[in-house]
């Protein structure tokens, strides 16, 4: 079957040749430049595709505004399938546009040869090209049968186990009023989403990390020394990364190696703590973390003058937060050693273990909580310094030139992170393999007396996940942006991985968190050693609850309320006639979008306008969250903004100057809302099934800002229109966003 065959064609652990399984194949093509009258199709050989007749080509479904997909199931040993992409006009009298080049070959779930771009020649000899992706996963016949059964069956209501805030509506057939059906496909209601955010699946996570400080305004480093030991192409291509200058224009300044390379002894403490679930009084599950030996020590009493000086020094390192986060930050600042005021999370792990994904997700979470957090990716430093053409030989431990170059950029990234912390930064995420004790000791020596280091090691023993990550890496990483042969890129990356495996040393020193087989979300282990303090505890709790299982999260405001019509703040009014119409359309949308999702749920606030909006949705459990209630307007509740301006001008001006921090008298600020939403975010991260969140403008602004990685200062200005659904698709490749406008 050739060397390019997918992992799914290999024998199972029991020695069978996949006789009990099938391959679920997904063909995807970017279509951001496809005109509205052209739709992507696939046609090809029998029996899998259908026909070489363009009129019988299979349409690709719109997975998002920028991606189309065709998926099908085949045996692992299926015959070679040859096919092509084509663009089909809606006008039948207009000829189809077939992609240029030879036929594509699919064998064992893998595309053979050069298959990363699809080229089309439009009118006027205009050439457009789109990236092409393929993914093949083995699925069992039982899974296929379950999916088909879920598709065919209507979800029947189950009994409620005495929980007052959970309900399931009756079957649609017995509903008193008919739903307002959507006349067309859901794609008809899709509207353009905002420009892709930093957290978008279209953006490689490492590219969003910090740029080197020594990168000048013109985009070049100082000095120049590029190792020539291991480039895949002998000629200097001068290719840029994200608009950055080519490697030949870059030079770099590295700290004196004599002050860096000397390693010191390992930390003596080896106590490993364990995590155990416990039951709180209100029945909610929590997590107990044994502090061990790392509890903060009390500092000596200070005079009044020295105390004032110290508070001035730490003012810039306090989080832009409220509630528990702010209180905990004060305690950590006052009680802990000076170096503990700054926290460095140092990633450890082999390539293709999800380090960068974890780093980006943790950065997003901490920023959303109000902590000044930055992501430093050593791979980005390396690419900016040495280019993107480094082969697997560059990463060999017996290649002294490669080792020196990689150590230099790691030291530079660490220096930049420490310098940023000394200017007031709070949490730095240091993203690299850091796979040897020598490298980790170097980092600890550089951080000594300046910041506290916690190692975060990701271990994965699931070959299927590793293989998937490798293929995603080749598709997304700038390291392989010039490698047109996909399978050649896979082979090179596997060689790189083998080089790291030969010298890998698990973390046993210092403070650390080990995540063992946690990425799949199906269990695994997490170990913590010498961990204490509020923020490290929150990080552990967040990591325990995150996973990579793809699932959609739908965010929508309630239907228009009577207070919306009157322009009044807050309140608990019913929905208007327009809101009732939206409630019916929303129910029809949910029925179409989540028809096969038996485990989906509907979350609302405790206010009646969200419950009335959800009332027409049937067949799914509904959960009320007080945390999803609208921002508390305090004494201004029920007033219009004009009344506030007239009767409380000082409050009106204070809110106008800083909507993020402004707190209504006896009410809440946006920062207060963020703090009460943290349990909601953790639960959304933990969920493996779709969730529909029906809430309010301020609350949805805060939730959306988390998923889109928007700065805190932008939250009060985020547009959150009525009668619009925002679909957030969470998965291994990042976050995809769609928007549906059901009515004006």
From Swiss-Prot:
Its main location: membrane. Residues 213-232 have a biased composition (Polar residues). Phosphorylation at Ser-220 and Ser-303 by CPK3 promotes 14-3-3 proteins binding. One of its GO terms (cellular component) is cytoplasm. A lipid is attached at residue 2 (N-myristoyl glycine). Residues 550-744 are annotated as: Fructose-2,6-bisphosphatase. This is 6-phosphofructo-2-kinase/fructose-2,6-bisphosphatase. It is found in: Membrane; Cytoplasm. Residues 301-549 are annotated as: 6-phosphofructo-2-kinase. Interacts with 14-3-3 proteins; these interactions may regulate both nitrate assimilation and sucrose/starch partitioning in leaves during the diurnal cycle. In the C-terminal section; belongs to the phosphoglycerate mutase family. 6-phosphofructo-2-kinase activity is activated by pyruvate. 6-phosphofructo-2-kinase activity is inhibited by PPi, phosphoenolpyruvate and 2-phosphoglycerate. Fructose-2,6-bisphosphatase activity is inhibited by pyruvate, fructose 1,6-bisphosphate and 6-phosphogluconate. Pfam families: 6PF2K, His_Phos_1. It comes from Arabidopsis thaliana. Coiled coil: none annotated. Synthesis and degradation of fructose 2,6-bisphosphate. Regulates carbon partitioning between sucrose versus starch during the diurnal cycle. The lineage of its organism: Eukaryota, Viridiplantae, Streptophyta, Embryophyta, Tracheophyta. PANTHER family: 6-PHOSPHOFRUCTO 2-KINASE_FRUCTOSE 2,6-BISPHOSPHATASE LONG FORM, 6-PHOSPHOFRUCTO-2-KINASE/FRUCTOSE-2,6-BISPHOSPHATASE. InterPro entries: 6Pfruct_kin (IPR003094), 6Phosfructo_kin (IPR013079), Carb-bd-like_fold (IPR013784), CBM20 (IPR002044), His_Pase_superF_clade-1 (IPR013078), His_PPase_superfam (IPR029033), Ig-like_fold (IPR013783), P-loop_NTPase (IPR027417).
